[in-house]
């Protein structure tokens, strides 16, 4: 299911014989997806075309997509559930950075348990055919888009939080009301920006070969609104990729300068050295998260820019759709990296998994305090200095 679609000019009527042709319920042929169109704008040839879903290339891509979706469901579903449960169970884990990570965990968890099963059915089982109705088509696309923007905004908020904590340590930390407002902003901005994704998402019958049809599920913008689509895409590209990446890079560059290249005045006690090592590990982990985010999402945005602003590049490419879905799957896999970095790698999730399976939600009265302290020491999260470096601030 595509989350963005491109646009075509009026002079491209007869250039799509290698793509799917689409038609509405009345039988009027239209321009091929995934480019935007309005029904009846194009007079497509009715030649029988090859079903690309039967090619070896698509078969290989289907295996890759299936493995990625299974990985997302397992890693993001289980890992984020355990982290959210731990955060709800242990109050000492509820600092600002962990709360910001929780927003990212919630969004990835929802995608893993709600969106990925439908996408597995769409991509792998039915091979690019949607059979679940318009409402679910729009809902799944919308939820996945909101999750992407929540993840981006949460990562940006975490970077700013680390910048303020390390570069300006004497400034007071955020109050509960401010933190709640920041979390509300992360979600509200994401929900609002993603509204067009739901509004323009629809189902369209694709005629692959004679007597064979598939139902496309994705965004379809009318040709007469191509200017608005391009403007919307550039807005999203700037607000939810370029801007956050630049801001996060500047924050971590300034933090790195503070931690590695600035001399610490006075005598360095063991406590100070431990805190410095902890902060450096934190920043290295966050830089890895940022690098993974760029490497996973840059190909997706680059592919989309070429498709939407230079459509002739892909017009004659037989395996265009296969390539796009693979790029999209790589982008979605970024949620697994976030989960592994923030939740699994240094969060001792096996202990919490055993407790959940045994329904041991409460510690014994005599040892509750000691148990909570032990849990706090064994659940360090790379991005959270307050947890990794207990009592050092």
UniProtKB/Swiss-Prot annotation:
PROSITE patterns: G_PROTEIN_RECEP_F1_1, G_PROTEIN_RECEP_F1_2. The keyword Transit peptide does not apply. It is found in: Cell membrane. Residues 84-98, 167-179, 254-282, 344-393 are cytoplasmic. The chain crosses the membrane at residues 63-83, 99-119, 146-166, 180-200, 233-253, 283-303, 323-343. One of its GO terms (molecular function) is neuropeptide Y receptor activity. InterPro entries: GPCR_Rhodpsn, GPCR_Rhodpsn_7TM, NPY_rcpt. Belongs to the G-protein coupled receptor 1 family. Receptor for prokineticin 1. Exclusively coupled to the G(q) subclass of heteromeric G proteins. Activation leads to mobilization of calcium, stimulation of phosphoinositide turnover and activation of p44/p42 mitogen-activated protein kinase. May play a role during early pregnancy. This is Prokineticin receptor 1. It comes from Rattus norvegicus (Rat). The lineage of its organism: Eukaryota, Metazoa, Chordata, Craniata, Vertebrata.
């Amino acid at each position: 299911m595509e989350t963005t679609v491109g646009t075509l000019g009026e002079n491209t009527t007869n250039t799509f014989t290698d793509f799917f042709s689409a038609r509405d319920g009345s039988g009027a042929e239209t321009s091929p997806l995934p480019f935007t169109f309005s029904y009846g704008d194009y007079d497509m040839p009715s030649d029988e075309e090859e079903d690309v879903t039967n090619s070896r290339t698509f078969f290989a891509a289907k295996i890759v997509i299936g493995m990625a979706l299974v990985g997302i469901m397992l890693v993001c579903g289980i890992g984020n559930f355990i982290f959210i449960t731990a955060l709800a169970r242990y109050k000492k884990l509820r600092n600002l950075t962990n709360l910001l990570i929780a927003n990212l965990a919630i969004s990835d968890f929802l995608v893993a348990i709600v969106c990925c099963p439908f996408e597995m059915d769409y991509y792998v089982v039915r091979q690019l055919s949607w059979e679940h109705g318009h409402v679910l088509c729009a809902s799944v696309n919308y939820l996945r888009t909101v999750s992407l923007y929540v993840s981006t905004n949460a990562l940006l908020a975490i970077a700013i939080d680390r910048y303020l904590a390390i570069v300006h340590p004497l400034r007071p930390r955020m109050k509960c009301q401010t933190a709640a407002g920041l979390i509300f902003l992360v979600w509200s901005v994401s929900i609002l920006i993603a509204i067009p994704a739901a509004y323009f998402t629809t189902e369209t019958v694709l005629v692959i070969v004679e007597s064979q049809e598939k139902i496309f599920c994705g965004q379809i913008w009318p040709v007469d609104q191509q200017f608005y689509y391009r403007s919307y895409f550039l807005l999203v590209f700037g607000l939810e990729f370029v801007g956050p990446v630049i801001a996060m890079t500047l924050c971590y560059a300034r933090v790195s300068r503070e931690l590695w290249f600035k001399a610490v005045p006075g005598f360095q006690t063991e406590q100070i050295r431990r805190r410095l090592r902890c902060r450096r590990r934190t920043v290295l982990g966050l830089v890895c998260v940022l690098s993974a985010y760029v490497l996973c999402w840059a190909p997706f945005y680059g592919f989309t820019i070429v498709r939407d602003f230079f459509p002739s590049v892909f017009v004659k490419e037989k395996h265009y759709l296969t390539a796009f879905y693979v790029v999209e799957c790589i982008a979605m896999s970024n949620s697994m990296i976030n989960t592994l970095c923030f939740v699994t790698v240094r969060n001792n999730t096996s202990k919490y998994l055993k407790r959940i399976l045994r329904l041991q939600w409460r510690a014994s009265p005599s040892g509750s305090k000691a148990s909570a302290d032990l849990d706090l020491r064994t659940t360090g999260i790379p991005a959270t200095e307050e947890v990794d470096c207990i009592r050092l601030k």
